[in-house]
């Protein structure tokens, strides 16, 4: 991929990972409201990934990051060790931190086509809101 597409490839990979991560964590959460949010968010991330791939003409096989499977496995491991919802929510927040950073890096490029920039800005707004909601859920479970 060209140098303007490399940060976009990272965003696509993060979206792929977060789709899987939200799905995996959502399936382990005991809190039904959090579970519902996570499963819906998994669907949203899948949609975002498809939108961005279409906008930039990316192959279907971009795949996830090397850290993605490790991130998901760590969340599963903590759940299996009895870490519970708080630990899963903390894991998700770490993933959301990576997503926020990926969007920030991609948007630094002054070579992005207008339609791609607009798409990233729209998606980034949602990512920030989701991050804040995950953090609030995590903090509520810590109390």
Segments (PLM) and residue ranges:
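Alpha-helical bundle segments that constitute or directly flank the non-heme di-iron/ferroxidase center
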Residues: 2-29, 87-111
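Alpha-helical scaffold segments that form or flank carboxylate-/histidine-based iron centers
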Residues: 3-11, 32-50, 85-89, 115-127
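Amphipathic alpha-helices that form helix-helix packing interfaces
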Residues: 11, 18, 25, 48, ...
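General structural signal for alpha-helix termini and helix-helix connectors
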Residues: 24, 28, 54, 58, ...
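Residues at alpha-helix boundaries and short interhelical turns
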Residues: 29, 46, 60, 110-114
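Conserved alpha-helical segments that form or flank metal/cofactor-binding pockets of metalloenzymes
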Residues: 36-68, 130, 134-137
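Carboxylate-rich helix-loop segments that flank metal/cofactor sites and access channels
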Residues: 51-100
């Amino acid at each position: 991929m060209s140098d303007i597409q490399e940060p976009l490839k990272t965003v696509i990979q993060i979206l792929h990972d977060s789709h899987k991560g939200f799905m995996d964590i959502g399936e382990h959460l005991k809190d039904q409201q959090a579970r519902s949010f996570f499963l819906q968010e998994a669907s949203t991330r899948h949609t975002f990934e498809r939108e961005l791939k279409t906008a930039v003409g990316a192959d279907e096989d971009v795949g996830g990051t090397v850290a993605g499977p490790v991130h998901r496995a760590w969340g599963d491991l903590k759940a299996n060790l009895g870490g519970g919802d708080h630990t899963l929510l903390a894991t998700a927040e770490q993933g959301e931190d990576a997503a926020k950073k990926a969007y920030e890096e991609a948007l630094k490029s002054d070579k992005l086509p207008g339609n791609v920039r607009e798409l990233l800005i729209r998606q980034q707004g949602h990512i920030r809101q989701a991050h804040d909601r995950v953090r609030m859920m995590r903090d509520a479970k810590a109390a």
